[in-house]
């Protein structure tokens, strides 16, 4: 499975979302190609809150206390972006989605926004959620050792509906936030494999990184993911079987 051509180095404990601990500043940005009803945005915002509470509860299982501070743009007045490209889970998604939005909001770019956060928000970590009112496949942009400095700011691009048109679950939000903190996918994707999917089905069938569920409380943060996101420092060699191609030399 190793593909040295897309090796990016480790994504664990690096970037604006280093470890799932302490206080996390979560900036949500609502964008769409046309005006989007406030009530519908609030319906999705409640899913974000449900995902946050689930993360708090799961961290507590590992003996960690976390909290969230929320920021928001676009809730009252939608940020209109024409011709938004949707995620498709191919690895060819747009990775420069955050900076143009932050510039539109008055910042000079990703790093300028991070300086503002450090100066104005009492927090340990920061994640930006871009919520787009369009069907597609959500994805996260987690910082790695070999990615450009501006990608230090970690973010998620969240679709309100799956490609099928079905409304997205809170579990999808929690899944992508975990990616920002270094979690690996535990199912078959462009950078993993069927073998990883098989092992996860056997050992971690209810992992948030392996599958989704309409009821997020049926899912857990498994031991591999707990190590990846910093809820535990315990590492077993077995965990390395789940490493994606981007973190295998």
Residue ranges: model-predicted function:
Residues 1-123:
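Propeptide-to-catalytic entry region of secreted or membrane-anchored zinc metalloproteases
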Residues 25-28, 127-131, 156-157, 179-180, ...:
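Structural recognition of the beta-strand scaffold that forms the well-ordered cores
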Residues 31-35, 133-138, 162-165, 187, ...:
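Solvent-exposed loop/turn segments at secondary-structure junctions
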Residues 40, 44-47, 94, 113, ...:
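Stable alpha-helical elements in mature extracytoplasmic
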Residues 106-150:
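Auxiliary, metal-adjacent structural segments of Zn-dependent hydrolase domains
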Residues 154-174:
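Short pre-active-site segment immediately N-terminal to the catalytic Zn-binding motif
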Residues 171, 176-194:
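Catalytic Zn2+-binding segment of zinc metalloproteases
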């Amino acid at each position: 499975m190793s593909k040295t051509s897309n090796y990016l180095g480790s994504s664990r404990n690096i970037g604006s979302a280093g470890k799932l601990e302490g206080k996390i500043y979560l900036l949500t940005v609502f964008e769409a190609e046309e005006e989007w009803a406030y009530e519908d945005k609030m319906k999705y915002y409640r899913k974000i809150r449900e995902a946050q509470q689930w993360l708090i509860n799961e961290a507590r299982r590992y003996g960690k206390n976390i909290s969230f501070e929320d920021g928001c743009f676009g809730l009252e007045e939608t940020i209109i972006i024409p011709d938004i490209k949707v995620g498709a889970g191919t690895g060819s998604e747009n990775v420069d989605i955050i900076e143009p939005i932050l510039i539109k909001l008055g910042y000079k770019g990703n790093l300028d926004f991070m300086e503002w956060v450090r100066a104005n928000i009492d927090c340990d970590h920061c994640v930006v959620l871009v919520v787009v009112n369009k069907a597609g496949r959500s994805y996260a942009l987690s910082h790695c050792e070999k990615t450009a400095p501006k990608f230090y700011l970690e973010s998620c691009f969240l679709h309100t509906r799956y490609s099928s048109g079905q409304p997205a679950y809170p579990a999808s939000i929690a899944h992508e936030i975990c990616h920002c903190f270094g979690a690996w996918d535990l199912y078959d994707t462009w950078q993993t494999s069927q073998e990883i999917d098989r092992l996860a089905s056997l050992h971690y069938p209810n992992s948030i990184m392996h599958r989704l569920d309409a009821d997020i409380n049926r899912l857990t943060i498994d031991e591999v993911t707990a190590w990846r996101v910093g809820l535990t420092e315990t590492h077993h060699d077995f965990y390395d079987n789940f490493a994606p191609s981007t973190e295998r030399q």
